[in-house]
């Protein structure tokens, strides 16, 4: 029993249960052989006894466990790594609906999951739980997808025509809607908790500041605050940081390493100053490790590419002794940055 428990404690595939059964079978054969030495008259009898009883005791429980595991998970309300892998399948009904109704939110969730999984691995947290939780953290946005900027490609922002208080109420409501959808799709509690905790009790600061600028009457911060609770685990705290950083990184005109590092420092400092991490077991060492991991991941994501010229351009360059490929690539990179900066200014204006 001890051998089997140790062998499957970190199982993330159903085949791991079969592998564990082989270890149990081998140990059982050895134990049965030792105890049967005094009762068996021949080696053949000893071998048959050890292989049969040892194998029966090792392989049969594995077959039973493989079939009973889904039933036991539901009855005991335990979420195993195997179940987390199933929840991370893009064909899961909730994720499939999210992709169809809010594709921008879906892609954001995928990116947050990548960042969170790497960060969790860096500090020894549950990386599979981080990935699965990140997939579902914005599930409530599919009810009104056009109210969230990542789904507004090529369309007007409806918040431009709404009072800030109403905009804040709509945006904040995706938490409650997400919790309702988590119940609808019968998501485990370990996954559902990512929905409220990834925003904690933060302020919807954009709409709060907008309301203060527009309204002559007093504006109360509590009307613009997420309901919480604050992150209660390392995993939900990691997703909170990754969520804010990933969204903000898309606004950088030049997402180079220095700008990304400054952005990460600013956002994480804001989360700490707002006391959002007070109720989770993350240490300052963990937080610094998470920041370093996110920086590595984002730097890789926003890497530069060489701009390969087409055949006509190549012909012209050959005739006029054009600059080498590295020089052309550098120029192309700067052009891309300048274009991005110009587009960002146009959007701001």
Residue ranges, per PLM feature:
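Catalytic or ion-coupling anion/metal-binding cores of large enzyme and transporter domains
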Residues: 46, 204, 270-273, 282, ...
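Conserved helix-loop functional segments at active or binding sites
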Residues: 5-9, 36, 40, 117-122, ...
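Long, low-complexity, intrinsically disordered segments
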Residues: 325-349
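Cytosolic regulatory/linker segments at or just downstream of nucleotide-handling modules
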Residues: 274-299
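Generic detector of multi-pass transmembrane helix bundles and their immediately adjacent loops
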Residues: 1-98, 103
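Divalent metal-dependent catalytic cores for phosphoryl transfer on phosphate-bearing substrates
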Residues: 95-257, 261-264, 270-274
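A glycine-rich phosphate-binding loop feature that marks nucleotide/adenosyl-phosphate handling sites
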Residues: 19-26, 48-54, 129-139, 195-202, ...
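Non-transmembrane, amphipathic alpha-helical segments
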Residues: 47, 56, 60, 64, ...
């Amino acid at each position: 029993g001890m051998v089997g428990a140790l062998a499957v404690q970190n199982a993330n595939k159903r085949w791991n249960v079969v592998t564990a059964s082989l270890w149990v079978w081998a140990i059982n054969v050895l134990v049965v052989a030792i105890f049967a030495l005094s009762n068996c008259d021949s080696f053949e009898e000893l071998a048959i006894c050890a292989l049969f009883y040892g194998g029966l005791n090792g392989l049969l429980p594995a077959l039973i466990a493989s079939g009973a595991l889904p039933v036991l998970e539901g009855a005991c309300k335990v979420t195993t790594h195997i179940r987390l892998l199933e929840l991370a399948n893009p064909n899961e009904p909730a994720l499939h609906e999210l992709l169809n109704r809010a594709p921008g939110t879906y892609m954001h969730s995928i990116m947050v999951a990548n960042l969170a999984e790497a960060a969790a691995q860096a500090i020894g947290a549950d990386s599979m739980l981080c990935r699965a939780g990140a997939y579902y953290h914005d599930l409530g946005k599919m009810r009104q997808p056009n109210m969230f900027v990542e789904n507004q490609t090529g369309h007007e922002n409806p918040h431009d025509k709404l009072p800030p208080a109403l905009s804040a109420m709509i945006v904040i409501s995706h938490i409650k809607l997400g919790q309702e959808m988590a119940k609808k799709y019968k998501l485990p509690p370990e996954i559902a908790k990512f929905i409220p905790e990834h925003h904690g009790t933060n302020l919807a600061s954009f709409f709060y500041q907008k309301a203060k600028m527009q309204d002559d009457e007093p504006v109360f911060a509590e009307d613009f605050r997420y309901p919480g609770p604050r992150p209660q685990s390392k995993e939900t705290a990691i997703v909170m940081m990754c969520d804010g950083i990933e969204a903000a990184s898309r606004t950088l005109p030049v997402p180079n390493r220095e700008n990304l590092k400054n952005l990460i420092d600013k956002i994480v400092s804001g989360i700490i100053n707002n006391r959002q991490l007070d109720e989770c077991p993350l240490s300052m060492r963990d937080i610094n490790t998470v920041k370093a991991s996110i920086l590595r991941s984002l730097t890789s994501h926003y890497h530069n590419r060489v701009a390969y010229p087409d055949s006509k351009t190549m012909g012209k360059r050959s005739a006029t002794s054009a600059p080498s490929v590295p020089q052309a690539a550098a120029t192309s990179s700067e052009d891309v940055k300048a274009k991005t900066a110009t587009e960002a200014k146009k959007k701001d204006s």
